């Protein structure tokens, strides 16, 4: 059998760092999938790329975004959108905090 690259405990640890919770069944499903993905990366790392120029993007297109200009929104549309939000505050959609500022890194 091939050497184990990743185990369920490691998958659980990474999941907790990402603030994800997996059931034991999900861990059993994801662990071999991640094992396979890591194996694919290991296979790619064996490819000789000598002479291949470094690439940071697959396209020559850059800065294709629109100009950043504030425009007044349609108030009726805004109200309709906010009506669908579970919680709002001061005309904005209120979402739960996702960044832990306790400083413990967990």
From Swiss-Prot:
Domain of life of the native organism: Bacteria
Annotated GO biological process: glutaminyl-tRNAGln biosynthesis via transamidation; regulation of translational fidelity; translation
Record's keyword terms, sorted: ATP-binding, Ligase, Nucleotide-binding, Protein biosynthesis
GO molecular function, one term: asparaginyl-tRNA synthase (glutamine-hydrolyzing) activity
EC id: 6.3.5.-
InterPro entries with a match to the protein in the record: Asp/Glu-ADT_sf_sub_c, GatC
Stretches that traverse the bilayer: none
UniProt family annotation: Belongs to the GatC family.
Subunit and interaction comment: Heterotrimer of A, B and C subunits.
Cited PANTHER family: GLUTAMYL-TRNA(GLN) AMIDOTRANSFERASE SUBUNIT C, MITOCHONDRIAL
Protein name: Aspartyl/glutamyl-tRNA(Asn/Gln) amidotransferase subunit C
Organism: Lactiplantibacillus plantarum (strain ATCC BAA-793 / NCIMB 8826 / WCFS1) (Lactobacillus plantarum)
């Amino acid at each position: 059998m091939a050497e184990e690259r990743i185990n369920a405990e490691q998958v659980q640890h990474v999941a907790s760092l990402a603030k994800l919770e997996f059931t034991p069944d999900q861990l059993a499903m994801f662990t071999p999938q991640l094992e396979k993905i890591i194996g694919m990366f290991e296979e790619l790392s064996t490819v000789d790329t000598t002479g291949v120029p470094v690439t940071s993007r697959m396209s020559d297109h850059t800065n294709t975004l629109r100009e950043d200009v504030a425009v007044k929104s349609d108030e009726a549309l805004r109200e309709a959108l906010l009506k669908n939000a579970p919680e709002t505050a001061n005309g904005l959609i209120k979402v739960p905090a996702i960044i832990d500022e306790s400083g413990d890194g967990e």
